[in-house]
Regions:
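Short, surface-exposed loop/turn microsegments at beta-strand edges and helix-strand junctions
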Residues: 53-61, 92-94, 112-125
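Sequence-specific dsDNA recognition surfaces
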Residues: 37-52, 66-96
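Beta-sheet entry/capping signal
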Residues: 98-100
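A short beta-sheet element
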Residues: 102-146
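Non-catalytic DNA-recognition/assembly elements of restriction-modification systems
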Residues: 1-53, 177-271
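Basic, amphipathic alpha-helical recognition segments used for DNA target recognition
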Residues: 38-46, 74, 127-178, 182, ...
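Short coil/turn segments at secondary-structure boundaries
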Residues: 52-61, 156-158, 227-228
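A structural connector/turn signal
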Residues: 88-89, 117, 161
Length: 271
């Protein structure tokens, strides 16, 4: 049986009486203590906002929870909307290489890095937007935020039964392992290359599957099987090291935030 002694004042200050909240997380203990940092020591929780409805005819891309592929932690299929169509939750302005963390049911791991092409676009207020410090690799930070030890802490901070949720403050106090800058870059490279290899394998498998179905259909209909070239993988150059990422960020336009850069001509540059 787990036992923990807390004073009434401590319980009242935390606003939580459940033992799971107050017990120290277990998973994070597997990492060296001298590498552990709070998220707010290596990143900021961004609060930039813009109301798209103020420019009803201006198009934008909306990143909501359904835009995140939980399996890979990548952004997939954001919505193309005009300002007049913006839902009330479409308010958070995101910068390239920001990290989106779904605050509703956070243990699902709906956590993604914002690609360059969605710089200055709009995300749901259902995300906590984490912006890595200049000396921290966003791809490494994304990896660390999806670790089981991180999701365990998100579970501890969660409130609510049907739709457990966390706050920006909970994200900020979460502990993650943070190695040297050089090691961060190495890990980021491994993760990005592994994800690219996974994507290529899926594309090849889908191609083989569709080609086989096409051949079977052609045989049944008596028509000749037409050869076709396999679709090539997209080959954009994605900056991975912290230095390259910072250089890319400096080349991007400023974010369009309410009260700053709000002219109707202010549009995000898609790269």
């Amino acid at each position: 049986m787990k036992r923990l002694v807390k004073s009434l004042r401590e319980l009242q200050a935390a606003g939580r009486w459940d033992i799971d909240f107050h017990l120290p997380p277990e998973g994070i203990k597997s990492f060296p203590a001298d590498t552990l940092c709070r998220v707010d020591e290596v990143a900021d929780v961004a609060k930039d906002k813009r109301d798209p409805t103020r420019l009803p005819d201006v198009p934008f891309q909306y990143l909501d929870i359904s835009s995140v592929d939980v399996a890979t932690g990548s952004v997939a299929n954001p919505q193309d909307l005009e300002g007049a169509e913006a839902p009330s939750r479409a308010r958070k302005v995101v910068r390239a290489f920001d990290i989106l963390i779904s605050t509703c049911r956070p243990t699902r791991g709906a956590i993604a890095v914002v690609p360059r092409k969605y710089h200055d676009q709009i995300a749901s207020t259902g995300f906590s937007v984490v912006r890595a410090h200049d000396d921290v690799n966003p791809f490494y930070l994304h990896f660390a935020l999806r670790l089981p030890s991180t999701l365990e802490q998100f579970r501890k901070w969660s409130t609510g039964s049907s739709y457990p949720a966390i706050l920006d403050e909970d994200v900020a106090k979460t502990l993650i392992p943070v190695p040297s800058a050089e090691e961060q870059d190495r890990i980021a490279l491994l993760v990005v290359l592994a994800l690219d290899a996974r994507d290529q394998a899926i594309r090849k498998a889908n191609y083989a599957w569709n080609r086989t179905l096409g051949e079977i259909t052609s045989r049944l209909s008596g028509s000749a099987v037409m050869p076709d070239a396999m679709e090539k993988a997209e080959s954009g150059s994605v900056p991975i090291t912290t230095a390259d990422i910072q250089e890319t960020i400096r080349s991007l336009p400023e974010l369009t935030i309410d009260g700053r850069n709000t002219s109707t001509e202010a549009q995000a540059v898609l790269i």
